[in-house]
């Protein structure tokens, strides 16, 4: 069990190996400096940080991968994707009952719907296959959405997750563990709750499908999150999200090893080993033509497939900038973003790159309310996005907010903490509504003419009036941060 470094001069390989051992400990790990993951211009310190950020910590179990394909420079071909799925299905052996768990319509860019249809086609001839979209706290998908995302799967094959009344509690992550991973910031247990469909279906295999991508609560989304949050219960979602908010999203986004992932990994390994879980994880990136392409596909039964894909996420989905941005304009596709609960990804994913005193303009023509859930919508309207200190103070005054910690976490995440301006141009919210929750209002129709998404490219743009902006066409595809600040944040 040792670290092997290849692809460079022997002297550099030996020196880098010692640095890696000091940073992550002795473990079975190969670092090929000839791989696109470790570009020639990276220093040894940057390579060590990249490995550490991927979650390869001292004593960590890497797990196994059933099937995978990866290409940092070119998108995977249809044949390569088909080969991986064929290998996965073959490795499962005979199965009678299979549950597929893809993300819902709010993750349409993940490519998971196509993979779900492909797996259904491979399995349905010999097995009873059902599909449970991982709604989390989101509203249920409509028939039109189901037909649009999963055209080849009959509607009677779909199940609906109810995070309030449709869950089973398996056990709980003890308070002592939460206290440890949060460095003493929190001292409560987190119940392990999953959809009752998982525990009562007599499944031979449960396959979770989704995209690995930087995320504000867990660091890198999907894998165990798709199961234990996407099909989780209210209290488990509340407490895990609040843990992320209290620990600070800026120290976690884009990181593979975070307190929230520690908690969800504990659930998977210690509290739910009886669930026959497998994972299908993608890594995707938008190409020069604006098409979102799959560059990595990893299948396995434990954290091995997640850890295999995490370095590629950091290579392709972290947009690290040399200097802070004065003005950022983010567009939210109305087919995907209909609430600030989802649309505030515009804030989460760009905040680390925005200059003090800078400006964020959010173009959300399809946004019609604040919360996905009526109760959470009511809490957002009552308390607004007014920063960490205000939200924590309100927790002591409002029992309803204290009983909905995921809403409190969202209020914290959705504030700039007064560091930069947020101008929200919501298509179906009034000026009074937008300003009542602490944002500056902007006219969506005027700004869509000024910043027409079809005329802008991702990144820096110069406008005819001389204005310079940084444009993001879909905040759900990555994280924008400063290179120096990101390198200095803790890898865990």
What are these regions (language model features)?
Residues 84-99, 124, 201-202, 318-327, ...:
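Glycine-rich phosphate/diphosphate-binding loops that line cofactor/substrate pockets in enzymes
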Residues 337-431:
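C-terminal catalytic subdomain
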Residues 160-324, 352:
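Conserved, well-structured core segments that form the ligand-binding/active-site neighborhood
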Residues 17, 21-23, 145-164, 371-404, ...:
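Acidic, Ser/Thr-rich peripheral helices and adjacent loops at domain boundaries
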Residues 2-6, 97-108, 130-136, 208, ...:
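Short glycine-rich or small-residue beta-strand-to-loop segments that form or flank ligand, phosphate
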Residues 108-126, 343-354:
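Histidine-anchored nucleotide/phosphate-binding helix
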Residues 3-4, 127-137, 359-365, 422-425:
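Short internal beta-strands
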């Amino acid at each position: 069990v040792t670290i092997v470094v290849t692809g460079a001069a022997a002297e550099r390989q030996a020196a880098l190996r010692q640095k890696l051992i000091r940073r992550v400990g002795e473990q079975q790990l190969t670092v090929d400096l000839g791989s696109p993951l470790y570009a020639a211009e990276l220093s040894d310190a940057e390579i060590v940080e990249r490995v550490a950020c991927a979650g390869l910590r001292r004593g960590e179990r890497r797990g196994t991968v059933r099937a995978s394909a990866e290409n940092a420079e070119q998108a995977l071909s249809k044949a390569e994707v088909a080969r991986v799925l064929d290998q996965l299905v073959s490795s499962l052996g005979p199965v009678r009952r299979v549950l597929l768990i893809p993300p819902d319509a709010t993750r349409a860019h993940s490519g998971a719907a196509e993979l779900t249809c492909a797996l259904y086609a491979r399995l349905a001839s010999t097995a009873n296959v059902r599909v449970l979209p991982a709604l989390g706290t989101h509203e249920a998908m409509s028939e039109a959405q189901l037909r649009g995302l999963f055209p080849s799967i009959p509607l009677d094959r779909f199940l609906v997750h109810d995070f309030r009344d449709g869950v089973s509690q398996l056990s709980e992550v003890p308070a002592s563990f939460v206290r440890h991973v949060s460095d003493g910031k929190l001292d409560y247990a987190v119940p392990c709750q999953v959809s009752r469909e998982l525990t009562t279906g007599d499944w031979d295999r449960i396959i979770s499908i989704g995209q690995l991508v930087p995320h504000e609560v867990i660091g890198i989304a999907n894998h165990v999150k798709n199961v234990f949050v996407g099909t989780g219960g209210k209290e488990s979602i509340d407490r895990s999200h609040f843990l992320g908010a209290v620990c600070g999203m800026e120290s976690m986004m884009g990181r593979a090893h975070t307190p929230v992932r520690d908690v969800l990994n504990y659930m998977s390994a210690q509290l739910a080993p009886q669930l026959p879980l497998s994972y299908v994880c993608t890594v995707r990136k938008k190409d020069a033509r604006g098409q979102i392409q799959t560059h990595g596909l990893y299948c396995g039964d434990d954290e091995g497939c997640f850890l295999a894909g995490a370095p590629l996420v950091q290579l392709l989905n972290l947009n690290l900038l040399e200097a802070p941005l004065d003005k950022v304009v983010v567009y939210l596709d109305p087919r995907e973003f209909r609430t600030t609960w989802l649309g505030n990804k515009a804030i989460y994913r760009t905040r680390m790159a925005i200059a003090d005193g800078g400006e964020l303009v959010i173009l959300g023509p399809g946004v019609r309310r604040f919360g996905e859930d009526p109760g959470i919508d009511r809490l957002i309207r009552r308390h607004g996005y007014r920063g960490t200190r205000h939200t924590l103070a309100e927790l002591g005054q409002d029992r309803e907010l204290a009983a909905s910690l995921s809403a409190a976490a969202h209020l914290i995440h959705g504030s700039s903490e007064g560091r930069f301006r947020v101008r929200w141009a919501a298509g179906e919210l009034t000026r009074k509504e937008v300003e009542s929750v602490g944002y500056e209002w902007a006219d969506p129709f005027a700004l869509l003419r000024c910043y027409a998404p079809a005329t802008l490219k991702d990144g820096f743009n110069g406008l005819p009036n001389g204005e310079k902006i940084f444009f993001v066409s879909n905040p759900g595809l990555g994280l924008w941060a400063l290179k120096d600040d990101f390198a200095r944040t803790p890898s865990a």
